[in-house]
Design a protein with these regions (language model features):
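Short, hydrophobic/aliphatic alpha-helical segments
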Residues: 3-21
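Amphipathic, well-ordered alpha-helical segments in soluble domains
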Residues: 11, 34-41, 83, 122-132, ...
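Conserved phosphate/anionic-ligand binding catalytic regions in large, soluble enzymes, centered on
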Residues: 17-40, 144-162
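Amphipathic alpha-helix face/heptad-repeat signature
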Residues: 30-34, 62, 69-76, 115-125, ...
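Transmembrane signal-anchor/signal-peptide helices with a preference for the extracytoplasmic
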Residues: 41-53
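A structural-propensity feature for long, helix-poor, extended segments
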Residues: 50-89, 189, 196
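Amphipathic alpha-helical interface segments
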Residues: 80, 84-153, 157
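Preference for long, well-ordered alpha-helical segments
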Residues: 129-132, 144-204, 210
Length: 210
């Protein structure tokens, strides 16, 4: 089942259920995609307007990036579910003999690495989403500036949520050096892009209250 083909109602129903997927990872990807779509909306409300003719080409370029990014995040909704399947299977492997224990450890290590790869990819996409939101807030239609702020906040939330999904998997890794490297990769993205998202929000909020 392709989770992205579900209606909003069905997706949320499955999210609330005991079903193994979607979970926090897929939900984060969807929230990130929604944030990027909001930014793209700002761009589409800006193009074709005489007032913004000077930035028309820049906005069109942003829109092209946003559309590609949204589709990437949509695909990551399903990718997260697909990554959970081998992880669940690995936990179910027998470990009664030394050979079984060794095999389970190897399979689990590979599955945990795969389960980290998707949220790290979501984080990377959300970082780009925050950059786009910053550009839309600066150059897009003032009538939709609140949506640019929302775009930044959605991508920020998805970024932080995905960092938690990295952490829950690295916590279980026996290769602590590898786990630390993945945690550091996530931490670098948080350190760089959370302040940018907050800056976009504060800028938009100040403009709306002026």
């Amino acid at each position: 089942m392709d989770l992205t083909q579900l209606s909003c109602e069905d997706f949320l129903g499955r999210l609330a259920s005991k079903a193994p997927a979607p979970g926090g990872g897929g939900a984060a990807a969807l929230v990130g995609a929604a944030g990027v779509a909001l930014g793209n909306m700002v761009g589409n409300l800006t193009t074709g307007k005489k007032k913004y003719a000077a930035v028309e080409e820049e906005i069109l370029a942003l829109n092209a990036r946003a559309e590609t990014l949204r589709k990437r995040l949509e695909a990551l909704v399903q990718a997260d579910a697909d990554a959970f399947t081998p992880l669940a299977a690995a936990y179910g492997l027998p470990r009664e003999t030394p050979e079984q224990q060794a095999r389970k450890a190897a399979v689990l290590a590979e599955a945990l690495d795969g389960a980290c790869a998707v949220p790290l990819d979501i984080m990377d996409a959300c970082c780009e989403g925050i950059r786009l939101a910053a550009d839309y807030a600066e150059k897009g239609s003032v009538l939709a500036v609140s949506d640019a702020g929302c775009a930044a906040l959605f991508c920020k939330a998805a970024l932080q949520a995905s960092a938690l999904n990295v952490a829950i998997n690295t916590k279980l890794m026996t290769d602590r050096a590898h786990a630390a490297a993945l945690d550091e990769k996530a931490a670098r993205m948080l350190a760089e892009y959370l302040p940018l998202a907050d800056e976009v929000y504060q800028s938009v909020a100040s403009r709306l209250r002026a």
